[in-house]
């Protein structure tokens, strides 16, 4: 069974505050809203088999609104759950099942595709969740703790080379480079030896700083082609404000799929702005690293999503030694299909962790 952790600590109404009738109507309102995205009226509830008059249902829905669990958008006669209502539903009424065997095979086959690097696997995991869950898939890469163990340049055809950096923790980073004319196997080996002598044991950030500082030395001590390889290697490994922590987002277009009303488009625009806040998103996903299961953040529970009214469902992925490596999840509107997305995120995180173990 998927283990869930609330992303919200503020006090909200409890299920014990509701009698059986109120609990049943509340559940039906939330389930209908999550399915359709439309405000739910008393007639919709009565057609669902509730043995109460529309007037009695309206009175109960009004009571739920006074508790802060339902709200009436604009002039609509229907109700939608508030963020507090969604939290109570997710924590107390949501029935989370499991994913199907076909989806399990899809996730495993795509992540364990032959020759896929760790970087490619994390991007693929994000894309998988985006496709299966209908939101934007998001992955934060592991914190790089190990030092550089080995650097190597490998020829790939006549005009390309691969810069390979192996770390003490066993992970491998690859960068594709343009191979200049005249680069020989001897030049590739000379450049590799030069960098190995200077970078071994350093973190990736330290290695990049050292490579930049050693360019003049390379130009003096190496032949022209080997020196150029070192320079090109520096260019290939540079870039990004926080190179040790990458944030991978796939499926932004999914967020536009059901945004028909103008206010929905404004919400999505704000969510797109949220997705550009790399530091804040990484910080939020780092909070997930301390959880032992799927964690759910709903709307205004987090400062980041307070304007866009979005939800994040995320889980840590970890090595076989139970070391937390990073976090993966799905971002979307608060009416995400929680019952479906939660087990998808949980299983994808587990498979990604196995893949990272090799």
UniProtKB/Swiss-Prot annotation:
Negative regulator of class I heat shock genes (grpE-dnaK-dnaJ and groELS operons). Prevents heat-shock induction of these operons. One of its GO terms (molecular function) is DNA binding. Keywords: Repressor, Stress response, Transcription, Transcription regulation. This is Heat-inducible transcription repressor HrcA. It holds the Pfam family HrcA. The keyword Ribonucleoprotein does not apply. InterPro entries: GAF-like_dom_sf (IPR029016), HrcA (IPR002571), HrcA_C (IPR021153), WH-like_DNA-bd_sf (IPR036388), WH_DNA-bd_sf (IPR036390), WHTH_transcript_rep_HrcA_IDD (IPR023120). SUPFAM superfamilies: GAF domain-like (SSF55781), Winged helix' DNA-binding domain (SSF46785). One of its GO terms (biological process) is negative regulation of DNA-templated transcription. Belongs to the HrcA family. It comes from Caulobacter sp. (strain K31). It comes from the Bacteria.
């Amino acid at each position: 069974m998927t283990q869930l952790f609330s992303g919200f600590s503020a006090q909200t109404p409890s299920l014990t505050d509701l009698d059986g009738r109120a609990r049943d109507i509340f559940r039906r309102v939330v389930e209908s809203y999550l399915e359709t995205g439309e405000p739910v009226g008393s007639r919709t509830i009565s057609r669902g088999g509730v043995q109460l008059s529309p007037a009695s249902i309206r009175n109960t829905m009004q009571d739920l609104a006074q508790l802060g669990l339902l709200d009436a958008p604009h002039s609509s006669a229907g109700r939608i759950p508030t963020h507090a209502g969604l939290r109570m539903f997710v924590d107390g009424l949501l029935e989370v099942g499991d994913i199907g065997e076909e989806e399990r095979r899809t996730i495993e086959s795509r992540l364990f595709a032959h020759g896929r690097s760790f970087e490619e696997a994390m991007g693929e995991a994000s894309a998988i969740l985006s496709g299966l869950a209908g939101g934007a898939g998001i992955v934060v890469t592991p914190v790089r703790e190990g030092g550089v163990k080995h650097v190597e340049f490998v020829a790939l055809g006549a005009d390309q080379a691969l810069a390979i950096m192996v770390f003490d923790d066993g992970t491998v980073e690859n960068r594709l480079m343009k191979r200049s004319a005249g680069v020989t196997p001897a030049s590739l080996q000379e450049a590799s030896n030069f960098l190995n002598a200077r970078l071994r044991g350093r973190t990736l950030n330290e290695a990049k700083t050292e490579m930049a500082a050693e360019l003049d030395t390379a130009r003096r001590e190496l032949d022209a082609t080997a020196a150029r390889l070192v320079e090109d290697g520096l260019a290939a490994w540079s870039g990004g404000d926080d190179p040790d922590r990458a944030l991978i987002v796939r499926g932004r277009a999914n967020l536009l799929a059901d945004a028909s009303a103008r206010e929905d488009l404004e919400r999505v625009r704000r969510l797109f702005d949220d997705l550009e806040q790399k530091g804040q998103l990484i910080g939020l996903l780092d909070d997930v690293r301390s959880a032992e299961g799927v964690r759910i953040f709903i709307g205004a529970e987090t400062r980041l999503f307070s304007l866009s009214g979005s939800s994040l469902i995320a889980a840590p992925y970890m090595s076989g030694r139970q070391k937390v490596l990073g976090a993966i999840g799905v971002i979307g509107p608060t009416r995400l299909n929680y019952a479906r997305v939660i087990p998808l995120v949980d299983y994808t995180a587990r498979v990604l962790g196995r893949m990272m173990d090799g």
